[in-house]
Amino acid sequence: MKKKSILLLTGIATFYFNNTYAQETVQDSTRTASIDQVVITGNSRPKAKIESSTAISTFNAKEIQKQNPISAAALLQRVPGFAVETSGGEVGNNLFARGIPSAGAYEFTQVQEDGLPVFEDGALQFANADNFFRVDNTTGRLEALRGGSGSIFATNSPGGLINFISKEGTNDFKGVAKLETSTYGLMRTDVNLGGALIQDKLFFNVGGFYRTDDGIRKTDFKANQGGQIRMNLKYVFDKGYAKVYYKKLDDRNTFYLPIPLVRNGNDITEFSGFDANYGTYSYRSISQLNIPQAGGGFFSRNLEDGIHPKVDVVGAEFKYDLGNNITVLNKTRYTNIDLNYTGIFPAGGPTSAADFAKKKGITGNTFQYSLVSSGQNVNPQYVQELGFWAIDKKMNNFVNDLQFNYKFDTGNITAGFYKSNWKSQQNWNWSNILTTATNNPELLNLVDSSLLPTSTGYSKTYNGVTALSFLLRDSQVQGSLNDLYANLDLNVTENLNLNAGVRYSRDFYKGYSVNTTSGNLNNSGLTTDGTHSFLTTTADDSMSVLGNQYSYWKYDIDKVSYTLAANYKINSNNAVYSRFSHGFRSPNEEAYYNYFTTTNPDQPLKPVTTNQIEVGYKFYTRNFDIGVIPFYSTLKNLSFTDVFSDGSSENTFADTKNMGVEIEGFARLFNNVMELTFNGTIQDPKYKGLAGNSTLEGNTVRRMPKLYFNISPAVNITKEWRTYVSLNYYGKRFQDQTNQDTLPSFSEVGAGMSYQLGKIRFAVDATNVFNTIGITEGDPRSPSVQSAGNSTIMARPIMGAAARASITLDF
């Protein structure tokens, strides 16, 4: 493990020190100075960044290429105010905006492509927004807005907007082709082509990627395999344009869950037999599940399918000048998603073989473990019960955003109507399996040797399964959103701009869930091994059976969001602004399920409401820029809805407050020889009025660091050579609201280099070069394992050291 870190670092250092300094080349000067940038996200019309009263970060295509993020979440780590957990792999990651706590996903921040949501709700169960889009060379730009006007230009987004803007064709034909490989078996091809079919009139862009790799954590199967294609066609006429586009995504990715670690104070070390940097329970030897169902038939699943979305998107955009300074813009999109989700979710931590047998009712030393694969008797020191979770979701979303803009001498007014219909139908089938507590787990059977094989309860497993289909869920959620919004931009003077916005949301939600009963296979006529009936095993004792009784529910939203801001441009390089915003977030999917399946809920179901105040200072030149944005926010009716390993859900409510400051900066130094990029956040998120336990008043919000930042210096060694180092720091957090379970701070170092040879760019990028064991989360599904007194914990660390090499041709 240490050897891999040293080799990675040595290779990078060799290139660094064996070259001399020189000015930055034109080819690799990729960053557009902030003073020249124009932004649209969170604004009614394109506006110079220095004149926008928003906290917004931008990345163009070349900057994204230079950073070469392994996932969308890795790219968003470069945005201040966004605390991002990237340890799940390429998808399924979590983003927390400005200290707003949640169960994960993108609950308070809407992820968009070209100004419309990837899916209307980015925090549906097992359907994180980043499951359904990928960053590749078809991405032309990223704009990431925090807080502010997010609640005016989108629904359920008080935390901000993340807008991935696609490339479009121009009169000049342009293309990019990229080949990439890695230390973990990566083979990836990216292509993008764009140009004009009719000069000045008809433009096209088409591109995508295909990738396969073994995963940084060793699964013994293809951990990531698939790709996407995106295309658009734009026709420009005298008074506007019309654009149509299509996206097809078919990709599967392994999702990494907590592994056992040893905690000694603030020190985290490996659990015996488990590699913290490269180990995982998601392994080929336990990847197949085929079990009988109490309602008849068999249920089969393959872990190698991982998170597997099939996404089809078709959309159109139309803009027309109506005359008299009035323009109309209409965006429409239909999204269809078929998601198969399969993952290994630990059901607690490693247990001694004797203790687990005792838990299953075997007293004394009459327990016997054996390998399912060979039948060989074994005596493991520790065993691990794992949840084999299978979820299928069928989702669709039709959205239309119609807006009118009136421009006058001192500003403009935008008014619009937003309509979105969406549906999510899901089916769960969860079982528990028993394995060795090691890197490459083996399925185990457990029997009570004091009984005869024909005795009731002789076996505690069925081919390694301890609980067959213990949880089934069949449920649906639908949303019908009907929102009116208006935004005013007023230039009071040449330097002073006022902004005011309001959004009225009349939204309707409904759904159903199917009630379940308990069953077993005792009278099914099936056998466990061709001879013995299911009376001989306890694995089927608590099976779930879907019934015919449906529970239907409805929930309506009638809320107003609003914002007021001012931006004062001191001179061409300096500006200050302030903003107040009020927004909300509708209850999430699990909150609906919990509330409407509970006979007498102890809390009313309410939207989460937010109030935010921010002030900002911006200083932009061509070689230096900095933004400093203090903020204060309060939230009411925040619900915590983590799903536990036994299938039950947390149902906790709280109010929170947070005060902090975001800092973002860039500098070109020493005649462009060196570049320095920095973003960081200091905050102090606290609980207020946690329901049912006032002793938690003032505790730090769980999973939220008080300090996190990224700093990345780069040196242009010669006209062709460039090298960089990056440091991600993630401060100490608490896994629980009692603030007893500490997740230590950690730093992750990355490094890389590139060589520009004409239009060809060679690059090597390395991540976590020191093999840091950095924990991003504990195990929210098994909170008892994380108690402060336990030396063995379950947690999800970042990936181990890895390197990627790429060749890119721009033409």
Question: Which residue ranges define each predicted feature?
Answer:
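N-terminal periplasmic accessory domains that precede
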Residues: 72-75, 94-99, 109-112, 129-132, ...
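Extracytoplasmic beta-strand/coil segments of soluble accessory domains associated
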Residues: 73-120
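Short acidic/polar hinge/loop motifs at secondary-structure boundaries
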Residues: 117-146, 165
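Transmembrane beta-barrel wall of Gram-negative outer-membrane proteins
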Residues: 174-176, 181-281, 306, 311-321, ...
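Acidic/polar loop-and-plug regions of large Gram-negative outer-membrane beta-barrel proteins
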Residues: 241-317, 340-389, 444-477, 481
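Structural signature of Gram-negative outer-membrane beta-barrels, strongest in the C-terminal barrel
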Residues: 395, 410-422, 427, 431, ...
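Gram-negative outer-membrane beta-barrel transporters
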Residues: 494, 623-641, 649-738, 773, ...
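C-terminal beta-signal and adjacent terminal beta-strands/loops
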Residues: 730-734, 754-811
